[in-house]
Amino acid sequence: MVAEARVKASWGANVNIKIPATAEGLKAIRTLSEENIPTNMTLVFSANQALLGALAGATYISIFLGRLDDAGHDGMQVIYDTLDILDNYPELESQVIAASIRHPLHCTQAALAGADIGTIPYSVLMQMIQHPLTDVGIKRFLADWEKVAKKKR
């Protein structure tokens, strides 16, 4: 895992290596962190996994909130717990990624919790930007404009 990560890290300064939240993954994160190679600990499903990743030196911790919810767990609680834990240890600099976002409420909740990053699918982004009252407002503006335009004729 480490040898492959070193090769991929040589591709550019903005490359972050995704490493799974496993015992071997934690060892790799520690080694890569010591070599200043940025890592993203992925497939995180508990605050304990996140803490271990931060202690190992992960640059990013990807908490799969949607998958947790899909399995009947409270994905947001894992994000809240992780952020609370990391707040207790200012020397841990890992950034929390709200991953596997399923709907706009996940985005709102993750932002309120203080997640550093969200991986937002295009479909959710489109849901976030659209609102029925915006559409109604546009129709009203256009109708008002037509009234003004008719008066000028």
Predicted regions and their residues:
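Glycine-rich beta-alpha junction loops
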Residues: 100-105, 123-127
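Conserved, mostly hydrophobic/aromatic
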Residues: 17, 32, 53, 110, ...
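Catalytic cores of alpha/beta
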Residues: 3-4, 28, 46-56, 102-117
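Alpha-helix-loop-beta-strand connector modules within alpha/beta enzyme cores
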Residues: 9-10, 25-39, 74-96, 139-153
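C-terminal active-site rim and adjoining tail of enzyme catalytic domains
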Residues: 100, 111, 118-122, 132, ...
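Glycine-rich phosphate-binding active-site loops on the catalytic face of alpha/beta enzymes
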Residues: 43, 59-72, 113-134
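Active-site entrance/lid segments in N-terminal catalytic domains of soluble metabolic enzymes
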Residues: 1-16
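Catalytic beta/alpha-barrel core
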Residues: 12-23, 38-51, 62-72, 95-100
